[in-house]
Amino acid sequence: MTRFVLFISCFFVIGMVVECKDGYLVGNDGCKYNCLTRPGHYCANECSRVKGKDGYCYAWMACYCYSMPDWVKTWSRSTNRCGRGK
């Protein structure tokens, strides 16, 4: 029983350490990656480039990625600086 509890505890600790995030990819200008005129596989390729698991073009406007590492910058409304200069 002790081994089982230890195993479950380790499982939760590993789950907390290996967290990934989902979100819109952001370019150097602070704007989301535009995919309106790109081929269908563009977003999946861009997400793979930053070590994401998968991605797609959300509503034909911006690339949305799944399971990216924490170091990848993603767009959020609170930190949006797209179109505001540098």
From Swiss-Prot:
Leader sequence segment: 1-20
Expression across tissues: Expressed by the venom gland.
Disulfide bonds: C31-C82, C35-C57, C43-C63, C47-C65
Chain positions found as Arginine amide: R84
MF annotations from Gene Ontology: sodium channel inhibitor activity; toxin activity
Segments forming domain LCN-type CS-alpha/beta: 21-83
Keywords carried by this UniProt record: Amidation, Disulfide bond, Ion channel impairing toxin, Neurotoxin, Secreted, Signal, Toxin, Voltage-gated sodium channel impairing toxin
Pfam families assigned to the protein according to its UniProt record, in alphabetical order: Toxin_3 (PF00537)
One of the record's GO cellular component terms: extracellular region
Subcellular localization: Secreted
Main location (coarse class): secreted
Keyword Disulfide bond: yes
GO BP field: defense response
Sequence similarity: Belongs to the long (4 C-C) scorpion toxin superfamily. Sodium channel inhibitor family. Beta subfamily.
Reported function: Affects sodium-permeability in pituitary GH3 cells in culture. Inhibits the inactivation of sodium activated channels (Nav). Slightly delays the activation time course, and consequently the time to peak. Shifts the voltage dependence of the activation to more negative potentials. Does not reduce the peak sodium-current amplitude.
The protein's name: Toxin To3
Naturally occurring in which organism (per UniProt): Tityus obscurus
